[in-house]
């Protein structure tokens, strides 16, 4: 039997207008990176029968940030960008294992989210995420039990914002 289990706690967050702008930039960047590299993989696969790996795309993302037209990507947390590439890689692997259909492009009008794997803080009345200096208010209605692993910030179609906190707990 497994000695560890993962559990997620979901809470509503209440960002200010400035924080909403910041979060929307994060959502947009994650969507852009996913779609840009999905298009790149698709084009390569059609031309050569092969496509870049996650690691090759991570290197390409790093060099993209140095280009003038993609300079705005420096405002985005690098680990959040890498998480978008990991999601794309997982979608590709599932497609080739015939578990799902071919990965689709992400749309702005759909549910949006991004993952923050490190360098965040959970405070008594909110959270702090990288590149955003202010605290985002959060209503914690349950106690968080376990070792916190990552945060996922999401936005619904009704423009409500949530944080999902992934924790690792001992299996008893």
What label would you give each PLM region?
Residues 1-172:
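Nucleic-acid substrate recognition interfaces
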